[in-house]
From Swiss-Prot:
<keyword id="KW-0133">Cell shape</keyword>
<keyword id="KW-0472">Membrane</keyword>
<dbReference type="GO" id="GO:0008360">
    <property type="term" value="P:regulation of cell shape"/>
</dbReference>
<dbReference type="GO" id="GO:0009279">
    <property type="term" value="C:cell outer membrane"/>
</dbReference>
<keyword id="KW-0998">Cell outer membrane</keyword>
<keyword id="KW-0626">Porin</keyword>
<keyword id="KW-1134">Transmembrane beta strand</keyword>
<protein>
    <recommendedName>
        <fullName>Major outer membrane porin</fullName>
    </recommendedName>
</protein>
<keyword id="KW-0812">Transmembrane</keyword>
<comment type="function">
    <text>In elementary bodies (EBs, the infectious stage, which is able to survive outside the host cell) provides the structural integrity of the outer envelope through disulfide cross-links with the small cysteine-rich protein and the large cysteine-rich periplasmic protein. It has been described in publications as the Sarkosyl-insoluble COMC (Chlamydia outer membrane complex), and serves as the functional equivalent of peptidoglycan.</text>
</comment>
<keyword id="KW-0813">Transport</keyword>
<keyword id="KW-1015">Disulfide bond</keyword>
<dbReference type="GO" id="GO:0006811">
    <property type="term" value="P:monoatomic ion transport"/>
</dbReference>
<comment type="similarity">
    <text>Belongs to the chlamydial porin (CP) (TC 1.B.2) family.</text>
</comment>
<comment type="subunit">
    <text>Part of a disulfide cross-linked outer membrane complex (COMC) composed of the major outer membrane porin (MOMP), the small cysteine-rich protein (OmcA) and the large cysteine-rich periplasmic protein (OmcB).</text>
</comment>
<dbReference type="Pfam" id="PF01308">
    <property type="entry name" value="Chlam_OMP"/>
</dbReference>
<comment type="function">
    <text>Permits diffusion of specific solutes through the outer membrane.</text>
</comment>
Length: 389
C-alpha cells in the first residue's frame, strides 16, 4: 500500500510538472507539521492531552514569501440577458435613434480569451500543536484581462440623421469584430486562511484548507482594437450607474462626473489534499473548489473625442461608405461611428473545481520550499518559502 501511494503521488507531481500549469494555492497538507524546530527558538512538541502542557508549547510562528502566478483563469461574463440601447438600424437611410429598446445582450455568459493575475506577498502563519495553521498574506497584485469586444459591450452610433449628434441619441450597433484588453496597476492585496492536518498514518497526511483573498486595483490601461473604432486610454475614467445616453461631454478630456475604473477582485476557496513524506521531499496532490469575481461596477468608458468637430470628425474613426459613392452632405455624421463606448462587466469563474499537484522540500525541519501547479479551472503556478521562528 505504501509503495502504491508513493507511486501515485510521484506520478501526479511529474504530470503536473510537464503539463500546462493551472485560484488560490491549496498548499501542502503536511505544512503545519513539517517544521518542528525553530530557527530562533527550539521547537517544543506539545501533547494537547498532557495536563502539564502550556500554550507556549502549543503555539509557534512561521513566516516567508508567497508568490502566486495565474497565467489563464477560466472566466465568463456575469451580465443580464438583455441590454438597453437604440434600435437596430434597418435599410440604407439615415435616422435618429432616441428611443431605448431592450435587445439580447451579446455579453451574456460570454467567455473571456485570457485572464492573468500575479501576486507577490509576505506570509505569516500561527501554528497550533503542529497540526493547524491560521495564516495571512500581505502583498501586491496586478492583472490582465482580454476578450472579444462583445464581452465588454462595445457599442456605437452609426447612420445618424442630421448635421449634429443630439444629446438624446443612443448607440444602435454592437461591435463584435474587435478585442478589448485591460491592464491593472499593482495594488495592495491580502488573504486569510486556515489549514489543518486532519489525519495521519505513517508518512501519509490528509488535510483540508480554506482561504479568502481580496484586492482592488485600478485599471492602468484600456485598449480597444476594432476596425471601425480603435482607441487606447491610460488610467481610464468612466460612468457608473449611468444609463444611455451618456453625457454629451463623454470622452472629452474635461468631462465631469466620471470615476476611476477600479476592479474589485475577491476569491474564496476550499480544498483537500493528500501528501506522503519521502525523507526531505513531501509530494502532494489535491482538489479545490473556488469562486473568483472581478467587479468594476459596470463602469462605462467612452472613446476619447474632440470637444467640437474638426473636418466633420469628432474621433479618429474611419468612414464607412458601403455601396455609396460619395459622402453625405446632409447627414454629416452618418458614415462613421459616433459615441463609441465599452463597459467593464462583472466577470466570474466559469469552472469551479480544479486539481493541484506540488511538492515541498524540507531542510533541517526549520526551512521549507514549496512549488505547486494548478489545473482545469485555471493554469497557475505557486512558489513559497518559509521558516519557523
Amino acid at each position: 500500500m505504501k509503495k502504491l501511494l508513493k507511486s501515485a503521488l510521484l506520478s501526479a507531481a511529474f504530470a503536473g510538472s510537464v503539463g500546462s500549469l493551472q485560484a488560490l494555492p491549496v498548499g501542502n497538507p503536511s505544512d503545519p507539521s513539517l517544521l518542528i524546530d525553530g530557527t530562533i527558538w527550539e521547537g517544543a512538541a506539545g501533547d494537547p492531552c498532557d495536563p502539564c502542557a502550556t500554550w507556549c508549547d502549543a503555539i509557534s510562528l512561521r513566516a516567508g514569501f508567497y508568490g502566486d502566478y495565474v497565467f489563464d483563469r477560466i472566466l465568463k461574463v456575469d451580465a443580464p440577458k438583455t441590454f438597453s440601447m437604440g434600435a437596430k438600424p434597418t435599410g440604407s437611410a439615415a435616422a435618429n435613434y432616441t428611443t431605448a429598446v431592450d435587445r439580447p445582450n451579446p455579453a451574456y455568459n460570454k467567455h473571456l480569451h485570457d485572464a492573468e493575475w500575479f501576486t507577490n506577498a509576505g506570509f505569516i502563519a500561527l501554528n497550533i500543536w503542529d497540526r493547524f495553521d491560521v495564516f495571512c498574506t500581505l502583498g501586491a497584485s496586478n492583472g490582465y484581462i482580454r476578450g472579444n469586444s462583445t464581452a465588454f459591450n462595445l457599442v456605437g452610433l452609426f447612420g445618424v440623421k442630421g448635421t449634429t449628434v443630439n444629446a438624446n441619441e443612443l448607440p444602435n450597433v454592437s461591435l463584435s469584430n474587435g478585442v478589448v484588453e485591460l491592464y491593472t496597476d499593482t495594488s495592495f492585496s491580502w488573504s486569510v486562511g486556515a489549514r489543518g492536518a486532519l489525519w495521519e498514518c505513517g508518512c501519509a497526511t490528509l488535510g483540508a484548507e480554506f482561504q479568502y483573498a481580496q484586492s482592488k486595483p485600478k485599471v492602468e490601461e484600456l485598449n480597444v482594437i476594432c476596425n471601425v473604432s480603435q482607441f487606447s486610454v491610460n488610467k481610464p475614467k468612466g460612468y457608473k450607474g449611468v444609463a444611455f445616453p451618456l453625457p454629451t461631454d463623454a470622452g472629452v478630456a474635461t468631462a465631469t462626473g466620471t470615476k476611476s475604473a477600479t476592479i474589485n477582485y475577491h476569491e474564496w476557496q476550499v480544498g483537500a489534499s493528500l501528501s506522503y513524506r519521502l525523507n526531505s521531499l513531501v509530494p502532494y496532490i489535491g482538489v479545490q473548489w473556488s469562486r473568483a469575481t472581478f467587479d468594476a461596477d459596470n463602469i462605462r468608458i467612452a472613446q476619447p473625442k474632440l470637444p467640437t468637430a474638426v473636418l466633420n470628425l469628432t474621433a479618429w474613426n474611419p468612414s464607412l461608405l458601403g455601396n455609396a459613392t460619395a459622402l453625405s452632405t446632409t447627414d454629416s455624421f452618418s458614415d462613421f461611428m459616433q459615441i463609441v463606448s465599452c463597459q467593464i462587466n462583472k466577470f466570474k469563474s466559469r469552472k469551479a473545481c480544479g486539481v493541484t499537484v506540488g511538492a515541498t522540500l524540507v531542510d533541517a525541519d526549520k526551512w521549507s520550499l514549496t512549488a505547486e501547479a494548478r489545473l482545469i479551472n485555471e493554469r497557475a503556478a505557486h512558489v513559497s518559502g518559509q521558516f519557523r521562528f
